[in-house]
Amino acid sequence: MTFKTKQNSDPRVIVPKPNRMRQLSRQGFGWLDARLHKHAWLSILTPDQIAAYTFLCLVANPQGVSWYRKDRIRAAMCIDEHALRQALYKLYDLDLVAYKPFSRHASDGFHQVLSLPTDGPAIP
């Protein structure tokens, strides 16, 4: 049985539960860019890096900015400080996330999920 809706105009696609189709929520803005998969970004990221990126995407405001402190991120992700630090540094290095401390000597700050570069990652 095929269900045709505005969101599903391809008759070859079967939506198993049409009453449960995802929609953007007014309560949050989190989303992931499909190019993470299409341009092979996921293939170069570790599970901790993917988890950190996903978390930041989900808690970001419309400008992509999150101000969660690292201890709250670690608690939400159930990882230790070293693992989070390594994951974030890789995301900064790949230019997927930018960081600005709350103040000059603060250890916490603003994380911004950046628009994806036009090309995929440089894979060695």
For each predicted feature, which ranges?
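N-terminal leader segment of winged-helix/HTH proteins
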Residues: 1-28, 95-96
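Winged helix-turn-helix DNA-binding recognition segment
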Residues: 2-5, 39-48, 59-117
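Acidic, metal-coordinating catalytic segment for phosphate/diphosphate chemistry
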Residues: 32-34
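Pre-recognition alpha-helix immediately N-terminal to the DNA-recognition helix
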Residues: 51-55
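Short, charged/polar, Gly/Pro-enriched secondary-structure boundary elements
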Residues: 117-123
